[in-house]
Regions:
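Residue-level recognition of specific faces of alpha-helices
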Residues: 6, 31-34, 46
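Short, charged recognition helix plus adjacent turn
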Residues: 44-45, 58-75
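Short alpha-helical DNA-recognition segment
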Residues: 15-34
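Short, basic-rich loop-to-helix N-cap that marks the start of a DNA-contacting helix
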Residues: 39-52
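Residue-level detection of the helix-turn-helix DNA-binding "recognition helix"
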Residues: 8, 12, 26, 37-39
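A short, Lys/Arg-rich alpha-helix, primarily the initiator
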Residues: 1-13, 51
Length: 75
């Protein structure tokens, strides 16, 4: 699963918009949109924010996807 797919799935599970996710993560809507379209991936600091957000919501986010992004591997 790509990072883009994981973010789309996360929003779907939470039933929130790109805007709502952006607000929760303190990032721009454009950033969420670029992630979902596979144009960019988050930096390491933002990955930690995503992890914490998922943990706070008891969401089993695709952490293997996060680890591959951390290592610079692209799916």
């Amino acid at each position: 699963m790509t990072f883009a797919d994981s973010i789309i799935q996360l929003r779907s599970e939470l039933r929130i918009s790109q805007k709502e996710l952006a607000e929760q993560l303190n990032i721009s809507v454009a950033t969420v949109n670029r992630w979902e379209n596979g144009r960019t991936e988050p930096n390491k600091m933002t990955l930690f924010v995503i992890r914490d957000f998922c943990k706070s919501k008891n969401i089993a986010f695709a952490f293997d996807t996060l680890k591959s992004v951390e290592r610079g591997e692209h799916n």
